[in-house]
């Protein structure tokens, strides 16, 4: 059911074409709006309707949770006070993520988004990882499962896969289902990492439904309802003060045409507690993960890392910003050493900074090691000064 008009209920198929007639009777089957949840789903892959698609048979012993979540008071949400180790040096060191934080990965196509997600799935120190693959190509879903969610990572993961050829209703339900599964684990006191790839595809599904209902299109063709549903989805993540559990959520956001002002990008940036921007220029220079440090931010980092870590991260950002501002002068040979101490320091530290950001896909760098390596970038000058 997607809406009402002139005393009639408007409905949309969950699957393909069906032999329906006008005024045909409609009978509900099963409990409406509930998701199967719990430990029975660990290691399993389900579709947007909750049906297992991994060939491992039916899921037995699962509990139930409302797809739309349970209403919580804002006072039931805890503050973000502890870091979440994701195993990626640049994120742990410069964009530290907290338990219960909501983070967006903003990226165009082909800049290493899926690879970065795979690194975090394997390395994150979480009790459970819930992954919603929404609106992706079927081939990419299979590839992600076989290469990014394998071995030990698969045993603690639940995957909800709804490819692009499924109905928009199922794509939205897939995101709701993944979030409901994460909420149920949080209610058990678990530390959950929730990954939705991608939030943009969820908005696209909302756009299809909204336009089918006759809603007026606004920016980039999105009707108001498509953007308005994003806060409801994102706000369900966070910490629970009663159980001690948390949902640390990572949402990928596709910057169509590398447009940072896309309505979905703008909306997500205003709601989320931080964003990680992947740069095509960095990817073209073979720097992976291609994180644009100067355009990325974690809004809770200063609350969860010690002061010396904060100072080293701030110094690295300053040197990187100075280098990027004067990059053309340096590359053309127009800058003369000794003209400006800040530029001299930025040039001296730049190779070490780029080496800090680079990381092999199969390498795991714990939070403690990332903090130590960050300070080591500056040698004997932990504040980033260059003598």
Annotate each PLM feature.
Residues 93-94, 100-387:
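P-loop NTPase catalytic core
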